[in-house]
Design a protein with these regions (language model features):
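N-terminal strand-loop-strand
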Residues: 12-64, 92
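Acidic, metal-coordinating catalytic segment for phosphate/diphosphate chemistry
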Residues: 2-30, 110-122
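NUDIX/MutT-family hydrolases
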Residues: 132-138, 144-180
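Active-site segment of metal-dependent pyrophosphate-handling enzymes
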Residues: 25, 48, 78-81, 85-143, ...
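Short histidine-centered catalytic/ligand-binding loop motif
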Residues: 64-73
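Flexible, glycine-rich phosphate/dinucleotide-binding loops
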Residues: 40, 58, 104, 144, ...
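Active-site donor-binding loop signature of nucleotide-sugar glycosyltransferases
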Residues: 54, 67, 158
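Short active-site-proximal "capping" loops at secondary-structure junctions
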Residues: 55-58, 70, 100-103
């Protein structure tokens, strides 16, 4: 099959864009930390992950994946490892980049506006766009009992997660899908 110049879609020239057309995009790193541990009263281990209670808006008081803005002096992997250590007090047994989540409508203000469950842009909404590079990590079962204890960090079985801040439920679902496949 050949494509003639007449059948090629028109592309707007780059000259039409100005610096003002580009909004700010922030980069964050989050980590889905998985560990096998038994539920209370059971012998067989199941998958658990630690969540962090948000101490500020947006989503103050809700649980979220450990993470935050990428610091200028950190690599992505360093930020993911730091997040894991801060949440659990442990070094990862395994750490790998899972996916980059960059939906334009990830911001809380944008996620609030939905039609039939699908997010829609909010005209004039002033929200910062955040792209999250998500890592997944595992902690050896032998070290789970040594994890850090803190009132704003709690381990949850993956089949009993609360409603998480931001799009973190979707991120966990994707991590579990990848783990199974």
């Amino acid at each position: 099959m050949s494509i003639s110049p007449d059948s090629t879609p028109a592309v707007e020239p780059y000259d039409d864009h100005t610096e003002g057309d580009h909004s700010s995009v922030s980069l964050a790193v989050s980590t889905v930390i998985l560990a096998l541990r038994p539920k209370e009263g059971q012998q067989h281990p199941s998958l658990w992950l630690p969540l962090v209670r948000r101490l500020r808006e947006p989503y103050k008081g809700q649980w979220a994946l450990p993470g935050g803005p990428l610091q200028s002096q950190q690599s992505l992997e360093q930020a993911a490892g730091y997040t894991l250590k801060r949440a659990t007090g442990l070094e990862p047994g395994y750490l790998e980049q899972l996916y980059a989540f960059g939906d334009v409508l990830r911001a809380p203000e944008a996620r609030a506006a939905r039609i039939n469950g699908a997010p829609v842009p909010v005209p004039g909404a002033d929200h910062e766009r955040v792209v999250s590079v998500v890592y997944w990590a595992s902690i050896p079962a032998t070290e789970v009992s040594q994890t850090r204890v803190h009132e704003n960090i709690r381990w949850f079985p993956v089949d009993e997660l609360p409603e998480l801040a931001f799009d973190h439920n979707e991120i966990v679902e994707y991590a579990l899908y990848r783990l199974q496949n």
